[in-house]
């Protein structure tokens, strides 16, 4: 499933190609989607190309070919009001209980929105509600939950619709599954690895590509410690 911005950009490119036979410039795309910078357009174009919706033609400036349009899928997504979001301040802090009875009480963990287990999405900052979590699922420190959207981590057992329980942390070890904030704009749930001087954000689905980024573009916002799933 495409995010709202990805779908809007795909439709804009397709309509421009039908009208004039020439794809829009990056400045025109930026203005059409009301984005602040062209870097956001570059990321959206890359995501659409990785998912097989467009193709960039080599040796030709601004040459983009639309391969397919996910009409039904995108329309369904828009009806649901898909608005991915992640992380704000005032995160729920888990404190040691003063008695055995208190230690058995469920802990209210704030749900901070949705996180992409797929192509990175724009990060908004909204707190929606809380969920009750058994205290033995949590360690010390601050915790929050994010609703997973996408299928890029299915081979790690993380499914679309799962609630990811996150321990707030600004660092990670190689192999940890983390909430990564990219360029202070996009957030994604991926496996973290160091590759020399770079950071690799790895999916757990062969349909998605590993993203290699310099450390100054990636901020760790927390580590996955468990999943909360309703049946």
From Swiss-Prot:
GO molecular function annotation: DNA-binding transcription repressor activity; sequence-specific DNA binding; serine-type endopeptidase activity
DNA-binding region as annotated in the record: 26-46
Database matches in NCBIfam families: lexA
CDD domains the UniProt entry points to: S24_LexA-like
Similarity comment: Belongs to the peptidase S24 family.
Catalysed conversion reaction: Hydrolysis of Ala-|-Gly bond in repressor LexA
Class of enzymatic activity (EC top level): hydrolase
Secretion signal, residue range per the UniProt entry: none
Oligomer and partners: Homodimer.
Listed EC numbers: 3.4.21.88
Record's keyword annotation contains Cell membrane: no
Domain of life the protein comes from: Bacteria
Function noted in UniProt: Represses a number of genes involved in the response to DNA damage (SOS response), including recA and lexA. In the presence of single-stranded DNA, RecA interacts with LexA causing an autocatalytic cleavage which disrupts the DNA-binding part of LexA, leading to derepression of the SOS regulon and eventually DNA repair.
Entry protein name: LexA repressor
Alphabetical keyword list: Autocatalytic cleavage, DNA damage, DNA repair, DNA replication, DNA-binding, Hydrolase, Repressor, SOS response, Transcription, Transcription regulation
Organism encoding this protein: Bradyrhizobium diazoefficiens (strain JCM 10833 / BCRC 13528 / IAM 13628 / NBRC 14792 / USDA 110)
GO-annotated biological processes: DNA repair; DNA replication; negative regulation of DNA-templated transcription; proteolysis; SOS response
Chain coiled-coil ranges: none
Any Gene Ontology CC annotation: protein-DNA complex
Record-annotated site: Cleavage: 117-118
Annotated active site: 152, 190
